[in-house]
């Protein structure tokens, strides 16, 4: 291992002390900086370089929703950056139940250097950030999943060489992934089409916001239920589970409603020949995507999953490093 860092040759942004609650809060330049920093840290890691800008720093990780990728990538990431991650489950801390969110935020601010929270209500994350004096990172809510999309944008840029003008077609439920993808695509000048069945459309307020942002950045954000037309000329096809955590009772109805929205080999053939397939994982093989697609040569899902580590290392470095 070496401690020699490589020269940073991209435009830096000052983000120290900021919260990361939604991509709508960040400019195009700031998002591109985080992607460039993620690429830089990924290369450092692959080259065996020790880089510890968070030595002596501690991140509290609050999980009211369980996760594989979010916990492992954040905990591994802060360790690689020289810091410490403390896992707090719903048994250890109950946001808004018993002790108020405001009191929790103030107490944790006295112990920690940053908070990552994965929970249900976006309002709880915003309340935590309002009263915390340290950076708060949204690890997922029912409304947004910005950390995942930061890694997604990094992955698309790695494979396609750019973001501006890239056509991304999201197929499935109009959920937190859809919302954050729309905001990320709007900020970076992409053309995104969200394809959902009637009754599963994205949040109207978020869709309106994304379209407004898109107008400022030369992006296009659309919604349709016509899957065949949407995937034409697609550079990226993206999907997610049909029933998210907490929606298990709706599983049978959702399987019926989404049966014509599966990503399979014949669907990929309708897109560009060099289309890539993405999924935030975990995947339910045989439901929203076939095994042939997720394991096929056009799939980048495991590269995408790995980039959660590098994108979040970039985020923690930018927000928490001295």
Curated annotation (Swiss-Prot):
It is found in: Cytoplasm. Its EC number is 2.1.3.3. L-ornithine binds at residues 176, 240, 244-245. Carbamoyl phosphate binds at residues 67-70, 94, 118, 145-148, 280-281, 308. GO terms for cellular component: cytoplasm. GO terms for biological process: arginine biosynthetic process via ornithine; citrulline biosynthetic process; L-arginine biosynthetic process. PANTHER family: ORNITHINE CARBAMOYLTRANSFERASE, MITOCHONDRIAL (PTHR45753), ORNITHINE TRANSCARBAMYLASE, MITOCHONDRIAL (PTHR45753:SF3). This is Ornithine carbamoyltransferase. It comes from Oceanobacillus iheyensis (strain DSM 14371 / CIP 107618 / JCM 11309 / KCTC 3954 / HTE831).
């Amino acid at each position: 291992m070496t401690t020699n860092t490589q020269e940073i040759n991209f435009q830096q942004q000052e983000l120290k002390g900021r919260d990361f609650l939604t991509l709508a809060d960040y400019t195009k330049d700031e998002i591109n900086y985080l992607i460039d920093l993620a690429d830089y840290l990924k290369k450092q890691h692959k080259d065996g370089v020790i880089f510890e800008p968070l030595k002596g720093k501690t991140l509290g990780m609050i999980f009211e929703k369980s996760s594989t990728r979010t916990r492992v990538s954040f905990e591994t990431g802060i360790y690689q950056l020289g810091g410490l991650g403390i896992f707090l489950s719903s048994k250890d801390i109950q946001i808004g139940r018993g002790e108020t969110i405001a009191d929790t935020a103030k107490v944790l601010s006295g112990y920690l250097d940053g908070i990552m929270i994965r929970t249900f209500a976006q309002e709880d994350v915003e309340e935590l950030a309002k009263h915390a004096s340290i950076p708060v990172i949204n690890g997922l809510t029912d409304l947004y999943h910005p950390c995942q999309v930061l890694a997604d944008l990094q992955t698309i840029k790695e494979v396609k060489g750019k973001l501006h003008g890239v056509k991304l077609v999201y197929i499935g439920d109009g959920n937190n992934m859809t919302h954050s993808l729309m905001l990320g695509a709007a900020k970076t000048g992409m053309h995104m089409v969200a394809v959902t069945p009637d009754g599963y459309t994205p949040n109207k307020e978020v869709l309106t916001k994304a379209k407004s942002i898109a107008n400022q950045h030369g992006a296009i954000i659309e919604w349709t239920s016509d899957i065949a037309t949407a995937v034409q000329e697609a550079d990226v096809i993206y999907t997610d589970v049909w029933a998210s955590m907490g929606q298990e009772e709706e599983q049978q109805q959702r399987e019926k409603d989404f049966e014509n929205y599966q990503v399979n080999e014949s669907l990929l053939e309708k897109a560009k020949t060099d289309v890539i397939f993405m999924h935030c994982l975990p995947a339910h093989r045989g439901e929203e995507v076939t095994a042939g697609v997720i394991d096929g040569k056009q799939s980048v899902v495991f590269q995408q999953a790995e980039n959660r580590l590098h994108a979040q290392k970039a985020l923690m470095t930018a927000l928490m490093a001295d």
